[in-house]
Amino acid sequence: MIYKVLYQKDKIVNPRRETTQTLYMEADNMVEARSTVEDNTPYNIELIQELTGNSLAYEKEHADFKLTKFDKK
């Protein structure tokens, strides 16, 4: 499954909508997606959303869609 992860670059600064960034990743479930991002980055995760059907098609067409791959630990 493909997940859209909204995050802030670090956990120290208070989150602001204007600085929220996005990455797209593949994972078996939402728990795995969260743990993978937490284990490999210093990011403050705001939201993880599963993308399917029309949502996935929209993101591929209208966003800077690129799957992020993390090394397995």
From Swiss-Prot:
GO biological process assignments:
DNA-templated transcription
Question: One matching Pfam family, short form?
Answer: RpoY
Which Enzyme Commission number(s) are listed?
Answer: 2.7.7.6
Give the GO cellular component terms, alphabetically.
DNA-directed RNA polymerase complex
Task: Write down the chemical reaction(s) this protein catalyses.
Answer: RNA(n) + a ribonucleoside 5'-triphosphate = RNA(n+1) + diphosphate
Subunit composition and interactions: RNAP is composed of a core of 2 alpha, a beta and a beta' subunit. The core is associated with a delta subunit, and at least one of epsilon or omega. When a sigma factor is associated with the core the holoenzyme is formed, which can initiate transcription.
Record-given protein name: DNA-directed RNA polymerase subunit epsilon
Q: Which organism is it from?
A: Lactobacillus helveticus (strain DPC 4571)
Name the gene that codes for it: rpoY
